[in-house]
Amino acid sequence: MVKVCFIGISLRLEHAAIERLRSELDVLAQQEPEIEFWFHGFHSDFIKSMLEEVVSLKKRKPNQHIEIVDAVDPIELDAFKKKAQEMELSEEEQYDRQLRADHYIAHSQRIDRWMVNGCDYLITYTYENLLDTENTTIKLARAKNPNLKVISISVPSTAERIEELKAQLDDRKKFVVDSLLDGASYSSLGRTLGITSNRVHQIVGKATRLIYRQLKEELK
């Protein structure tokens, strides 16, 4: 039994990304006879899309051992059930078992990291030419688990569009983003600019939000 997790930015997936995902899921189902797909929360368009495609895979492979596992914070026990109702899933299409992550109660990001660090396959939708916590989580997971198989469904044309949008940032934001991507630390960059590292974080956050906001408009 292999464990599959997902991590991605909160964008509506392009048609090309969905097609890549379906293809990768079919290949995975051919390679692995027993698969668990792990989820935690349904707070992003990305995770909602992943659930829809896993449910579709289960329908296409009715005789294969494919399970949906819901890792839950006891405070949000019904998150999966509510989403399943929204998607009008039948009872057999909902999660196969539920795992209470009690030791991480009320720490959503820690549950996500705990899941990712223990998975065999990680399906990702991120862009390395932009700073976000998802890329950091992937790097940490790879360092912790050298055998982790990472499957990217990102789209090259979107990566190119991100470069175009970065070029439209004002000089300060662009300098900060490019410097951090090149390996500069927040503290050293703060000293260079004469500002606090916290202010550097704020600048990066604003730049990232501007780019994601534009991408969301274009991908509607």
Each language-model region and where it sits:
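Acidic/glycine-enriched connector segments
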Residues: V2-P156
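Short alpha-helical "recognition helix" segments of helix-turn-helix
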Residues: S188-L193
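Short, Lys/Arg-enriched C-terminal cap helix and immediately downstream tail that follows
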Residues: T208-K220
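Short glycine/proline-centered loop/turn elements that form peptide/ligand docking sites
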Residues: S152, S185, A207
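Short amphipathic alpha-helical boundary/capping segments
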Residues: T158-L169
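Helix-turn-helix DNA-binding elements, focusing on the entry/boundary residues of the two helices
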Residues: Y186, S197
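Short amphipathic alpha helix immediately N-terminal
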Residues: Q168-A184
